């Protein structure tokens, strides 16, 4: 296309996108395939004048500019600074979040608090399948499990996330030159049944107030597109914390077979060591060597400092129920950061669904054993399913 044809195409593309976005149901945003469906719907108007490959090339070049120009809400941005105003100051809001009473994590009070709220980690089930919704209702109605307060020493995906989330935060801080602080489970200021637990919020002057959501991938592909449940989780977190921006960070760490392989990999700088300890034979303690300090002498000195911290005369001894377990040698294989803006339009349309479900839960709590009719029929995979219907749903006025 010559310059005039490109300008005409862009103008037509803008008109098509703006028109389609105005007609679209806001609840379409949480669908994983939102951007793909939007592109396909827009292409229908151009399929008689150009090939799909030509259309895709130009569309991908200008789509983010069009959204920014028309102040449309995009599901996510690969470039995390596209819509962030670094001059805004959220110090007052951050202090408010710090001052909100929050039970300590993993305590009985923490579990009780979470059971009394819809939280970011499970609220996606309301927007998935009927079975997933029933599972959420069952979780809120069922009596607490006798094992709910116990930790374990499994090496499953949950513990993998606990092990590598602090490292992901360290890399995020390093790459963005910021400071991230942890927060507990925060209740919504006005909606009493909603709460959220952000992985972190930037508290340094640079990027002040930006939220961070971490996912440590074990095996799935990192596509730079937040899955449905993650998108909903971030929207609830931004709503609860009243902050407009969230960076969605996905990392994939690999572990060396042994110490020897770690030191042989001389040219990889994004690697390091974790000293793993066990407390009371029930939970892990992770101590992270500083980033980029991988000389053998420095790692040995770090191990000695860990033994001294826990009063361990040697790694084979135990003190106050704490003992050395092993050293993990890791390397960062993939780091991905995607910017997700707060979508108040989506939340305003999603809130009635949340309230309807919570009202039902409150009604069922008055009935003995009401949880049994919501009990999942099998223990098959609980992986959330994306809706089968396309997300571009037109609102008929």
Residue ranges and their predicted role:
Residues 1-397:
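Accessory terminal regions of nucleic-acid processing enzymes
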